[in-house]
Amino acid sequence: MTNFRLNVLAYSVMLGLTASVAYAEPTNQPTNQPTNQPTNQPTNQPTNQPTNQPTNQPTNQPTNQPTNQNSNASEQLEQINVSGSTENTDTKAPPKIAETVKTAKKLEKEQAQDVKDLVRYETGITVVEAGRFGNSGFAVRGVEENRVAVQIDGLHQAETISSQGFKELFEGYGNFNNTRNSAEIETLKQVTIRKGADSLKSGSGALGGSVSLDTKDARDYLLNKNYYASYKRGYNTADNQNLNTLTLGGRYKYFDAIAVLTSRKGHELENFGYKNYNDKIQGKTREKADPYRRTQDSALLKIGFQPTENHRFSVVADLYKQTSKGHDFSYTLKPNTQYMTYDEKELRHTNDKVERKNIAFVYENFTETPFWDTLKITYSHQKITTSARTDDYCDGNDKCALAGNPLGMKYNQDNQLVGKDGKSAKYQDINKTQVIKERLPFTKPNGRWRFHKVDWDALKKKYPGVPIYASCLEEDNDPSEFCTYEVKTTKKENTFEINGKRYDLLSEADKNVISDEQRLPTNVSYLFSCDGLNCDKKTILGFKKRRNLLKIFLFEVIEKRCQKYGKTKVKANDQLSGPYLFMPNKKGYQANLWSQRDLTSETKQINLDLTKHLELGKTQHDLSYGGLWSEMEKSMTNLAGDTPLNVKWWAQYPHNCATFLPPSTMTPNAKPTLNPERTSTLCNNVNVFSFLIPVKTKTGALYFINDFRVNNYVAFNLGYRYDRVKYEPEYIPGKTPKIPDDMVTNLYIKTPEFDASKADSDPDELSKKEANAAANIKEIAQPKKFSASSYSFGTTLDPLNWLRLQAKYSKGFRAPTSDEIYFTFKHPDFSIQPNRDLQPETAKTKELSLTVHNDMGYITTSVFDTRYQNFIDLSYQGRRDVHGHSKLIPFHFYQNVNRPNAKVTGFEIASQISLGNITKLFNGFSLSYKYTYQKGRINGNIPMNAIQPRTAVYGVSYVHPDDKYGLDLYISHASAKNAEDTYNMFYKEEGKTDSTIKWRSKSYTTIDLLGYIKPIKNLTLRAGVYNLTNRKYITWDSARSIRPFGTSNMINQDTGLGINRFYAPERNYRMSVQFEF
């Protein structure tokens, strides 16, 4: 039914266009038809305008030219004004093949607030969902994340650690913020979305497409005045987000500047039914979205200096910081506390951050020379850090386990244990003897002696385990008919009395109050803070094991880290026979197990971009050429530790936190011994390590593009780019964060040999192990070079005034990331070995489009075919023995390899119709329609999960002739994701025979209504209703973010409990108010 509706609309629009051409008033040259004018004339003529200009090419539009500048420069100024502060594309003009341009005005009209909103009303491109970390790049034509290039002002943004082995080992556990960074929408002047191979513009990574983000410039606002000011205040109910953005621009003589300051504060995105779900449920079956507090702060600063009309200097600072703090209630690992119940339990706290800083210096030259018309040199220094901080602790203070003191235990001035009432505590551990007289009747009258007449077996059954000796207290001549026997029983009494109440320490019920862990044997020494003891007395009163008597323990006072401690002396030879000390609980603090994982990408880049217009005979040529050089350092730093919180007076401090203790002086040739206290939480241990070898990437590139028109009917686009990439690992032992030894030992180099069983306790064996690890890392970390050629060939044919044919053939590539080459891990169940022989991935796109257009609008249909080669994927390499490990445990090895091929095909429809051209009654009204269908397979039969199901977006828009108000209605439809188009790569490990994904998205339709009004010149009010019909639905990107294993983004795969957490929000609203001067 959906396809039928789509086809009816498509053909109806096409017939309407054709009819409007046939019955239009005759004219020799419609305003948007080919003319004999040069190709650099007004932009609404259907020329083959450059489709692959680099995003950082010169913008030869100075704003502070002297008043006597020539008319050509004035035209250029007018053009830049159009591209910045208003729409830069004629919505009636036919689009370029596989390209969508969105201006700041378009984004404002769509009320976009993040990158997901950039593509909300687009088809064929979506945003990758990453659970608690938000979004991670885009998915286009079957590929995603690093295979879709993302640039901001010509700079590549941070890539994820794309090694599939790394993802399987770490990504499912919520410890790494392994996502691609985003951008602040309010700072963007223009967004260009290109589908298909696109390395000509973006270099490595543009296999499925690219998204180029260009930031605002003062010249966008200061054409007809010397200042600009704007303030916007907004609110979104879906995530309770508050928006504040201030834009200031000004010009004085030769200087101009702009500042865009934006702040967003909100919470988690509220899923459908958010207010109805139980907030207390923890684990993977939780249906309510996990709570987070999110902030995003951005500052874009640009200062320009233009002393003459041909020379311009600029300084740029683009600062962006995004934070998210909250709780992972859906985290699947929870502690199990035996016998004890507490008001508060351990909880995972999250603190994630993405920070980007870019400082750039730009020089632009507008002097026309034989070699260029414009020249632009840009130096950029960008640093991007993605961080994930997790803290696992109980934040209920004294309500938490091991921190409470419900009995109010403390030591008084005499160092005697007392309770809340101030009275001394009492302890008793004795065996209490009891004598019971049993009167046993004669049951055997024929017995010779008195004790022969008694059934002693019955008495033994009554007192099992008690010795019974056949004898009677009465004499044999006693006339009585019974036998009296004294049974001696022993009952163990183990009690603790405090606050006037006695607790039975043998009772399971009382273990909730007094547990075995609260009794400290004195066969070892303890170190207590003098905050809880009277250290001036230097004695402490404890309890003997079997009698309710006090025992004096001597201790010495020592001072460490400016704090005094009392160190008790050993008072017993073994744990069972010695006396006891009682404490409120064992630890006396809350342990915070924390980790912070930072991924850093730091780039230094120089761009040289030139343009030149040539007329050769009757042909018009627009040349773009130049190059770049960049140096990018990518590294990982992992910090992990164990920190005490809410430390109490009874906490047992370690005597020594060193890893090894000095050798004994009593034993000849003794070696240092491993310190058992080295792992104590009170040592505040911090480990610094990394799973990745730091790598410096050097990239050089040259490109040349020629857009030329042969005549009014034929135009071509030719481009070529050469990239050279070199990886230089920079692992320096002792300085670089350490790679864990066990990940690499004996992988390639077998010497020096060491005894793995003694390496953790013997310093000599540990040194050998570290030397072995260093040798293997050196063997792995060898430089690697890649080179790649990218090209594009396009043609545009305009055989008729209303018909356009476009064809494009392009090639893109993606060099293997450093982690795909060098990542190493060693474990019997899952070992990964590096692969220095990986080849670049390549993509070749063939696309053909047909466009019918006139003044009324256009409808474009296109078909495409993209072939991917050398796809990098994880492959099982088999089992083998590893030197230094038991041969009984073979290691399972995996490795990144190049897969042969993948293929994606599909077709798209895009249309934009202005109804005012049909009748004046519909002036201001327009219709739009977009549709995408695509299908893809890897190696011929494996579905590509990144492909979206069929999607369509219908649009109805109205804009007042004087732009005083406007309305937009969007109807978005997505078909169900079919099972045969999904692939679960873990189905064999899960013991399944079906390789499809069980939980998928169903068909859904949503309606959004957006509008704005300008009651006065300087004021704009905007509002929007999203999911107007309150439809419950889940997108395919959200559904496929559910992980089959791990601790994060999990649901119950059998019942589906927890999947509601991934559903889109209910009906929600956005509103904003903006003042402009």
From Swiss-Prot:
Acts as a receptor for hemoglobin or the hemoglobin/haptoglobin complex of the human host and is required for heme uptake. InterPro entries: Plug_dom, Plug_dom_sf, PT, TonB-dep_rcpt-like, TonB-dep_rcpt_b-brl, TonB_Hb/transfer/lactofer_rcpt, TonB_rcpt_b-brl_sf, TonB_rcpt_CS. PANTHER family: HEMOGLOBIN AND HEMOGLOBIN-HAPTOGLOBIN-BINDING PROTEIN 1-RELATED, TONB-DEPENDENT OUTER MEMBRANE RECEPTOR. It is a multi-pass membrane protein. It comes from Haemophilus influenzae. A motif (TonB C-terminal box) lies at residues 1060-1077. Belongs to the TonB-dependent receptor family. Hemoglobin/haptoglobin binding protein subfamily. A motif (TonB box) lies at residues 78-85. It is found in: Cell outer membrane. It comes from the Bacteria. Residues 89-216 form the TBDR plug domain. Keywords: Cell outer membrane, Membrane, Receptor, Repeat, Signal, TonB box, Transmembrane, Transmembrane beta strand, Transport. This is Hemoglobin and hemoglobin-haptoglobin-binding protein A. This protein is subject to phase-variable expression associated with alteration in the length of the CCAA repeat region. This mechanism is called slipped-strand mispairing. Addition or loss of CCAA repeat units would change the reading frame and result in introduction of stop codons downstream of the repeat region. This may be a mechanism of regulation and a way to avoid the immunological response of the host. It holds the Pfam family PT. Disulfide bonds: none annotated. The gene is hgpA. Its main location: membrane. Residues 25-72 are annotated as: Disordered.
